[in-house]
Each structure stands twice: as C-alpha cells, then as structure tokens.
Amino acid sequence: MARRGKKPVVRTLEDLTLDSGYGGAADSVRSSNLSLCCSDSHPASPYGGSCWPPLADSMHSRHNSFDTVNTALVEDSEGLDCAGQHCSRLLPDLDEVPWTLQELELLLLRSRDPRAGPAVPGSLPKDALAKLSMLVSRALVRIAKEAQRLSLRFAKCTKYEIQSAMEIVLSWGLAAHCTAAALAALSLYNMSSAGGDRLGRGKSARCGLTFSVGRVYRWMVDSRVALRIHEHAAIYLTACMESLFRDIYSRVLASGLPRSCSGPGPGSSSGSGPGPGSGPGAPAADKERETPGGGAASGGPCSAASSASGGSSCCAPPATAATAVPPTTATAAVAANHHHHHHTLHEAPKFTVETLEHTVNNDSEIWGLLQPYQHLICGKNASGVLSLPESLNLHRDPQRPSKPGELPMFSQSELRTIEQSLLATRVGSIAELSDLVSRAMHHLQPLNAKHHGNGTPMHHKQGALYWEPEALYTLCYFMHCPQMEWENPNVEPSKVNLQVERPFLVLPPLMEWIRVAVAHAGHRRSFSMDSDDVRQAARLLLPGVDCEPRQLKADDCFCASRKLDAVAIEAKFKQDLGFRMLNCGRTDLVKQAVSLLGPDGINTMSEQGMTPLMYACVRGDEAMVQMLLDAGADLNVEVVSTPHKYPSVHPETRHWTALTFAVLHGHIPVVQLLLDAGAKVEGSVEHGEENYSETPLQLAAAVGNFELVSLLLERGADPLIGTMYRNGISTTPQGDMNSFSQAAAHGHRNVFRKLLAQPEKEKSDILSLEEILAEGTDLAETAPPPLCASRNSKAKLRALREAMYHSAEHGYVDVTIDIRSIGVPWTLHTWLESLRIAFQQHRRPLIQCLLKEFKTIQEEEYTEELVTQGLPLMFEILKASKNEVISQQLCVIFTHCYGPYPIPKLTEIKRKQTSRLDPHFLNNKEMSDVTFLVEGRPFYAHKVLLFTASPRFKALLSSKPTNDNTCIEIGYVKYPIFQLVMQYLYYGGPESLLIKNNEIMELLSAAKFFQLEALQRHCEIICAKSINTDNCVDIYSHAKFLGVTELSAYCEGYFLKNMMVLIENEAFKQLLYDKNGEGAGQDVLQDLQRTLAIRIQSIHLSSSKGSVV
C-alpha cells in the first residue's frame, strides 16, 4: 500500500497534549509520586516510531462526535505503540510484590468451582502464575499512585483513600467487586477484635484473606503511599488485589479458549498492546483473519464507517465499536463464542499464559488496566474495540417494565443514542458536549438506582451529582476536535495547523471521563464535578498530561444547590468569600472576612466542617493563626460529626481540632503557638471519655516526627490513649492503636524508645467494673498507691503487647525485639513472624536469639499456626542452615514440641486362624509335596499349609504345574532366614522363634516379601525395642527402603524425641542433609515435619490434650 510520507521531525512532549496549563509541557508540574514515580528514561520504540504521526486526510471529513466512535486512523495504531514505548512514560516495575506465587496459587485454587476437580497445590503452571502476578502488579501500582495523591490532603491513607483510588482506576464493575470484598474482610477483622485471641492470630487470618495484610502494609509504608497508613487501608488494598486476581482468573476460565485459538490473541506477544502484525505493514492474510469474537483482528477487515469514508480494506483501522461488533456486546460476543467452542470440544478450561493473554486482550475492562503505560487506557481491548462494560449494558436487561402497564424506560433508538453518547471520544462544541453529558448522566442515574451492584455512584446522599459549567468547559478542552467545527458552512478550515491531534487509540470515551470525575468528586463528598476533577481525569487517561494533586481548600465542596432559596445561596456566597479572604494569607482582611462568615463569626464552619483556624493550621500560616487567635477563634472547636448538616465532612476528620491539623502536616511552630495559647494536647479527648478520633500524639508517632512527639510529651500527652472504633468494638477501655502501636506499626524505632522513656502518669483511683473483676478485691481494702502503679503497669503492658503484634506483623523485627527486651511476653504468632523476617533477612545472630526464646512461649498458646506455618518455617531453616548452633537450637525445639510422652507403641497383629501342621513336619522330606531351593539347599514343605499362608505363597505355588516335581528356587533370602519363616508358619506364631540380632533385618525383609503381616509386625516391634542412637539410622533407612510405614513412623518419633543427641551423630546428619546427593534428605525432613505435626495435634491441639499419643 502506498503511504504518505512522514516528516522526520523529533517532536517534543508538547505534541502529546493540548496544553492545559496544568501539564503536558516539559516544564509542567509533575504529580508527587514519591517512590512510586516513574523513571524518566524510556526504552526505544521496537517499531521504529519516534513521534506522533501527522493528521490524516480522512480526519478532515465532516463527522460529528458520534462518528468518532467508529473512526480511527491507520497511523493511530502506530501512534499508540509510540505512545506506549517511547513518548509516554511507563509505570515503574516492582522488584517485589506483597504476595508470593504460592499464596497466589492457593487463592486461585480456593476460588475455583469445586466441580472443576480437586484443588491440588502445584496444579497451576508457574509461568502463567508469574505472568498474572506481573500484570496485576501494574494495577497495584496504579491504585497505590492514586491513593498516594488522595492522601496528601490529610497526610494519611485510610480505607476511604483506597476505596476512592479503586473507583478512579478500576471500571465500575471491578470497583464494586473489590469494594464488596474489602467490606467483607474488614467486617471479619472487626468482629475478631472482640475475641481474646486477636493478638494470637495474623491479620490475614482474622480477615479471611490469603495474602499477608502485614506485608501489604509494609509495602505501603516502604512505597511512601502516605506518611501515615491506617491498618484498614492495608486490609482494603489486600482484599482489592485478591478480588482482582479472582476476577481475572474466573474470566480466563470462562473464556474457554479453544485449541484452534490457543496462540496469543491479537497483539498478545507481550500482553501490552497491538503487536507488530497489527499495523499497516502486516501481511494481507493476517489482515483478513478474524478474532474468535467476530470482530477483526488489529488491522483486520475494514468497518462500515471506514469504507464509507473512502478507506480500502488494506488500510482499514482496527475494528471498532459500532461496526464489526456492536459496542455494548463486543466483550460478551467474544466470551460467548469462546463458550461455544469450549462446549464443542468438551475441554475443561485451562489456565495458561496463552489463555491469560487471550482473555486480557479481548476484555476492555482489564486490558488497559494491565498495560505498562503510565496513562490508563479505558474502554478498549487490544484491538482498539470500544465497548461498554457489562454493568452499563442496557441490552443485557431489555428494560422490561417493573409494573404491569408501565412503559419501558428507553426505546431501542434511544438506547443506541445513549450508548453512542457514552462511547463518544471527540466533540465539536461545548453545546454538543453538554448534550452528551446530559444524556449520559440521565442514563447512569436511573441505572444506578435500578442496579445498585453495578458500582455507578451517580447520587450523592443529599441528591444527584451535577456538572459545574467550568468542568464542562475543561472537559470540552480535552475532547474538542477542531475539524468538527467545519460542519458550520460559515467557518473555513484553518490553513495553518498549530496543534497536533491525539490519535484515536489514546482517546478515552466519555463514560471514562465521567467515571473518573465522579470518583474524585465523591472522594471529597462534593455535590458537583468541578474543573479540577476533569483535570485529574485527564492526567490519568491521557498520555503526557500532568497536574498537581488537589489541595485542602475551603471551596472544595462549595456548590450553589438548587434546593436552597436565593437568600440562603447569598449567605453561602458571602461565607465562601470570607473563607477565600482568610485563605489568601493577608492578615489585614481578618475583620472584613469575619463580617462575611455569618452568625458564628470567626468560628464558622465550611461545608467540610472546618473553621478558618483549621485551614490556617493546614497551610502552616503562623501569622494568620496568631491573627485568628487574637480575633477570638476557638482553639478547641472540633470538626462536627453531623453529616446531615455538613455532608462534605471527611469521616476521618470528625472530632479533629486545629492542633490535630497542625500536627498532621508537621507545622511545629504552629503546634507550639497553639499549645502556648491553651490548646488541649489530647485534641478532642475529654478526661475519662472514650476517644473516637486519633490524638495529636498518635498522629505524630505514626509519622515518626521525633521533635513533635517530644513536644507533645512535654505538654502532657498520654501515649496510652487509643482510638475507639465507631462500631463500638474495642479490646481495651482506652481503644486500639495507641501511640506505641502507631510508632511500632510504622517502624519508627527512635520515636518508640522516646515513648518508652516517658514517665508514667498517675491516674484516678476510680476503678472500672472490668478492673474490679480483674483485681478480685474489695474497694474498701484497696490501697491507692500500689493500685495506681499496678493499673498503669497493666495498661502499659496491654499497649506494648498490641505494639509488639503490629511490629511483628509488619516486619519491623528490631522494634519487636526492643519490646521483648523490656519483658513483654511472646505470643506464638509474634515469635513466628519475627523468625520469618529474620530468616528472610539472613540475620543469623537474630535467628539464634529468637530460637532460644521459644521456650518462653506457654504451651497453652500453641495454635494451629504452629503446625501450618511454624513447622514448615523451622524445617526450612534447618534445611538451609549451615550453623551448628542454629541446628542444635531447632533440635531442642522439636524435642520440646514432641513432648515428654512416650513414642506410640507398635502392637502385634493377631494372625488369622489358618491351617497348621505339627512341627514334626517342618522340613521333613517324607510326605512333603513341594520343595524350595534356597542357597542351593532343598527345603521341604507342604502345599496345604502354604497355600493359605499369604498371597505371595499362593502365587508361587499356583505358577507351578501340579505334576511338576522341580524345585521352586528362592533368591535373595538366606537359608536360616527362610527356615525361620517356615518355622513361624508351622508353629502358628512367632512365640517359639529364636531370632538373633543380626538376623532381624533380613527376617523383616523376608516377611515383607512373603506378605506375612503378623511376622512383619513382630519384627518391627523387635526393631523398635532394640533401637538406639547407634542403629536408629540403619533401621530407619531399611524401613524406608522396604516401605514399612509403621516402623518408619516409630523411628521418626525416636529421632524427634532424641534429636538433641542425634544431631551430633554423623550418620544422622548425613541422613538429614543428604550429603551423598541421593535426594532422600528432603524427604526425611518432610517426613519428620509430618510426624511432628501429628504429634502436636494429638498432645497440644486436640481436646484430649496428651492422652492420645
């Protein structure tokens, strides 16, 4: 195909965007991504593209915004490659993710349909798991980056920031699934908080999750998602990732990829976009190939729109929404076709790299999410096909009337118009955009009311959301297509083009603009979408666009609600003007501003429930704070908790004071000023009352600000005060996550030591009912001074135990050791987590210290975790350790866990009553009817006895003809041993046998060979009685060789019970570590682990507690 020539001009970053003043230019303000920010270096484009292609002639045709759904350029496919590989920045690659492939496989196997067969670990291919992990890690980075930006407003990441980040990044349906999973996990966690064993179970176990919540929390801290991380945020993020994995895995299995399509889908060579065969230079045969979904592969058959505009089949764009496949059913058609092939071939769905890539490439909800580009591609699959997500698919529900006689909500023509509105990518004017947005909102709001599970939050609690005029103008700026203005006959096309059009493949549909803008507005509890919401959406959805994160301002949630009359709106505007005057920083406008604020004057609250003093503290404006204090501002007024009056209050800010905001943003001079002026050092906490918000000291300890913590402690802040959750669930009267726990959870060792050094404050002598019952003493006989000291010590011990739990969960083992060093006892869980981290960090001295501490753990605290987590960890350390001290310490632990009870005895097997002969006939040639030849010597026997002795003898005798007088030769058995076997049979039991010590092993082998179970058990019992440290390895090796499980288990019990002595035995060490390289050492360790697990279950975890051994 002849192609137009391209100018070999290296274009700058400005070519990627219409400069908004907020980004796109090379010197634009970049978002604060901290450790999640991307590298400025970019790999070279593998396809030779280095710039955006020039505008094509076909784009100058007269199309309205609806036609942009179906119109794309051939060069646009190359433009996307250019955008992804060179011109657009890429997401950072994670060296480590907060989950393991073993955990991922366990999660997926748990989520599969039980009818698909048993979930066997190791049944999923490792390469597919690794591929899936890598893809979903990109979604993790996207969500973390958005949560990081949202957390800047309050310098804290809570569950609300994670939930909003999910709604910003994920489609409506995926976000709804993730939110439901997060709510379920948090509910389980809160319910488990009331139990007495909450510090003895891991956070993941308490939440019902597979991935480690503590590891996700540590990842968030290390990635600097926020200065402060709430534990609920880590639970939400963990549940979100698990939900994403399950969702993608279920889609892969549901796709049922047929064998004929087992190769990668279009552009699926790397799962990151259209491949080399999708461009205009692909062979003609490839261009005519259709995808299984009915649409054309990238660069496939031309659509009706492109044909109508004069395009040929050789230069057609990728198949797009309304032509090759209906826009609302593109993804469904692909899945349906796959389902048909699946049933045709009668194959079980397979999870492989090929099926994974094929599913991702054909799913518009997840393809863009899992790409490596920094901007988020939404609403398109790998072929560039636009489609509505299933949650917005009106054709799925044919709008049947809910009541008899009621008309359908939309006609079919209206449905097509609405769908085209949602999928529009370009507009020609602000009027056209306003009409499109109106149609879309009109469609989404009733859909949300009808299908609450589709995740379309189109309603605020106080009413429907609406678009401010400035937001529409900003959105029009990004969606505007100058060529569409040429529809007006009075407007002539410009002769000089000063702007570069973005390619179609990077333009998001209108529904994605709405989704992201609505999520941003919802996060700040606003009634309306403003221009900043649109700019934030442009930053996410378009390549090369950036803008600063939204700051905390008084006008964030201001809106002229249509429900208010003119007088109320006038007062709102005056109040807004007053806040603006105070926020400008001019201290000479305080009096004029106060006169505009309303009847509450200087203490008037904004829609966010904050006073001018709070906003000044957020900015760190010391001069304005002083002026407001001089003007009579209340130091200790709290953010209100009445949502009906102040609906835009962020839930986490309720009961915060001006001092809290100053501490949040680390403005130490302002904190000093407020405290000198009489601010309460504990914020809103009243003496003796429950605390439902975090104190300033908790917030300072969480961020690790040593100077601020010292200042608050000097002013009398109490580090033992925790936070009560609003559901009323708390484990202590003072709440959870006190200052000790905050510092330990974030790994601030110096701040934690500072808190420990703080002298204890004496409390009131009034006892609570809980403390009266705990003390078990009479009030009249209580001596106040000792009681105060005792109560303080108990409260501090509870606080430190909780801090130890969080530090161990999050992997801050040094903080955990510091807490242990002051006498706080171990729980099994904290000890195991600390040992795991020390082993991962290869800290040998710390491992030795922790192993020595195991004996301090009470046996009453042994739980199932010791079997499922502890034993595999310790045996892994034993396997990897080359340190004799560590090996000896582990042997001590194993012997201790095995317990003082004796090894379970082997019992004789009662021989079934069979035929027997007088011993006189033993090896008697007279009257014998069968002769055995053993070591060249004959041994005479009788068939009547041997035929019923065992299946082995029956088979030997049956194989010889009756009239054959030849001898039956017995190999591999010595004559004396064979004589003992025959003596056992003729005498009817082992009682008369005289077995020498050097014959017992051979007799055991013979009994096993001839399948004489009673004689075999008798030999096993003799071996068990004669076992000692010298022969135990030989007996065990012989028993394993023969497959005698009972004797092997007895030997394993002997090993565990005497391991402290045996570890010095060279033969035993050789058995464990497999120095001969025969591969048996690992099996021995696994067998020992299994035997010890059974023993622990019987003596520590069963109801009998030791009686079953």
UniProtKB/Swiss-Prot annotation:
Entry GO MF terms: PDZ domain binding; protein heterodimerization activity
GO cellular component: glutamatergic synapse; membrane
UniProt entry tagged with the keyword Repeat: yes
Residue windows of the ANK repeats: 608-637, 654-683, 692-721, 735-764, 830-859
Region Disordered, residue ranges: 260-302
Keyword Membrane: yes
TM annotation in the entry: 168-188
InterPro entries xref list: Ankyrin-BTB/POZ_domain, Ankyrin_rpt, Ankyrin_rpt-contain_sf, BTB/POZ_dom, BTBD11_BACK, Histone-fold, SKP1/BTB/POZ_sf
Subcellular location: Membrane
Listed Gene3D superfamilies: Ankyrin repeat-containing domain, Histone, subunit A, Potassium Channel Kv1.1, Chain A
Biased composition (Gly residues): 264-280
Stated name of the protein: Ankyrin repeat- and BTB/POZ domain-containing protein 3
Gene: Abtb3
